[in-house]
């Protein structure tokens, strides 16, 4: 249902904690697309998770906005969520959003900050 887009630049140490926090979601109706924006030390995901994780590495630094766009173009799901590498979702965010979408079948865009 969701692809969570995570831009990251020179903060690979944030990624394990971010992914671990997503294991606390009350549903796993999502995958994660991490866009490594040409960090000095590349982002690597070596652990398995109960959701798919894809890492894309930019060959040149593109900035956070373009990295989000790259993530969106490489997303596999219909709904996109954006999460910075040093931020965390509430544990029930994906479930609550799925419930809202199910209740409002014609919804095409939701935003929460």
Predicted regions and their residues:
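Conserved donor NDP-sugar-binding/catalytic core segment of glycosyltransferases
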Residues: 88, 92-108
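A conserved hydrophobic helix/loop-capping motif in glycosyltransferases and polysaccharide synthases
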Residues: 2-14, 18, 25, 35
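Glycine-rich, basic loop-to-helix element that forms the pyrophosphate-binding segment
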Residues: 58-75
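Conserved short acidic donor-positioning loop in nucleotide-sugar-dependent glycosyltransferases
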Residues: 10, 22, 37-39, 62, ...
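Positively charged, low-complexity/disordered segments
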Residues: 109-113
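Acidic donor-binding segment of Leloir-type glycosyltransferases
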Residues: 19-57
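Short aromatic/hydrophobic "clamp" motif used to bind/position activated sugar donors
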Residues: 80
